[in-house]
Amino acid sequence: MEPLGYQQRREPMKVEQNFEVVYDFSNLCAAYRAARKGKRWKDAVAKVESNALEAVTVLQKELSEGTYKPGNYHEFYVFEPKKRLIQTNSIKDKIVQHAFCDNILYPVLSRPFILDNYGSQVGKGTHFGLDRLRDFMREYYRKHGSADGWVLKADVRHYFASIRHDILKRDVNRLLTDPRSQALSDAIIDSTPGNVGIPIGNQSSQVYALLYLNELDHFVKEVLHVRYYGRYMDDFYLISEDKEALREAWRKIEQLLAPRGLELNQKTQIFPLRNGLDFLGFHTYLTDTGKVIRKVRRSSKDRMRRKLRKYAVMYENGAMTRKQIEESYQSWRAHASHGQCRSLITKYDAVCASIFERSVTSNHAAEDQQPSCPGKGQRYEHQILRRPHRICDR
């Protein structure tokens, strides 16, 4: 079903692009460096790195002649924050995806995105989305003078696994104009068996997933005229003073998603704005005085506490280094610092620091001379070590 003739009213933005940029040697070298980042310890990456020049040259020939075909995927599960199937491709395919996504796919497909589509984009991301939610709440309070209002909070059930190949290829090829770009995109989409589902681990899948719900974004903003709307991948919210309007929006959104093979999660609900909403790792709520409060979600706090307990045991056994623990904790700490979480951070700083204050084996004697996780009043500092580049690094 096409609500209100929406699809017929919108015309795609055409952008000319030159496929040669994908197999340009310097771009392939840049893609190779991006693909190996953080993975140089893996055997498959080390094998390519030992003869990177030849690997890049072969890829350049395959792409220029149109003979490149994506390989098979390696599958595994992750369990945080929930169980998900991850499908990752080979280093060769990662190089192609970086070259294609960075030079053509993302620049072209992102052009029709609305401002409040936050996921996996340059200049956006989780903290941008959180700041937009904060600004929406402040604006709502200025307009209505209270925190009385309603929130429709929703996400799509099994989003990546439900994306239909035929609809996705149609959406992509309305924007890509070079037949070679269209052919490569189609090959990547069809590299997974069947006609439904794209792999979470692919760089291209992030761009495709952003585009697949672009129609929803414009429908909510331009047809339903909901100003206070934001989406991060398949997780989105609508804020309104009218509960019945949100119920009607819920119904129309389900009608819009059904032909695309999507359905909303059973946890989708409408609740009072003053209760606050969970979005992007924080619980954000609007007070009766118009102040916006942002706290780390309880699940995030519990997950970090469990990790620190696990790290303490692993450090005692020599299975984890101080640097590894500090890097993991610093990532969570930087995230938590975007909320009103000073006392929580101080508490967890002390827990992290206590790991290194316990009796440890002689393996850690040298490490214990280095600065540990910050305690109360201390500033967390972290140095980034750079490795020397080799082939294709210039």
Enumerate the predicted regions with their spans.
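Right-hand nucleic-acid polymerase module
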Residues: 2-4, 89, 98, 191, ...
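A common structural junction motif
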Residues: 254-262
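Short coil/turn segments at secondary-structure boundaries
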Residues: 44-48, 70-77, 111-117, 145-152, ...
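Active-site-proximal segment of RNA-dependent polymerases
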Residues: 5, 9, 15-19, 103-161
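Non-catalytic, polymerase-adjacent accessory regions of viral genome-replication enzymes
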Residues: 1-57, 369-376, 380, 384-391
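Short, conserved non-catalytic motifs in the polymerase core
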Residues: 38-46, 71-98, 112-125, 188-210
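Non-catalytic, well-ordered alpha-helical scaffold segments
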Residues: 26-29, 53, 57, 93-98, ...
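Conserved polymerase palm-domain catalytic core
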Residues: 55, 62, 131-233, 237-254, ...
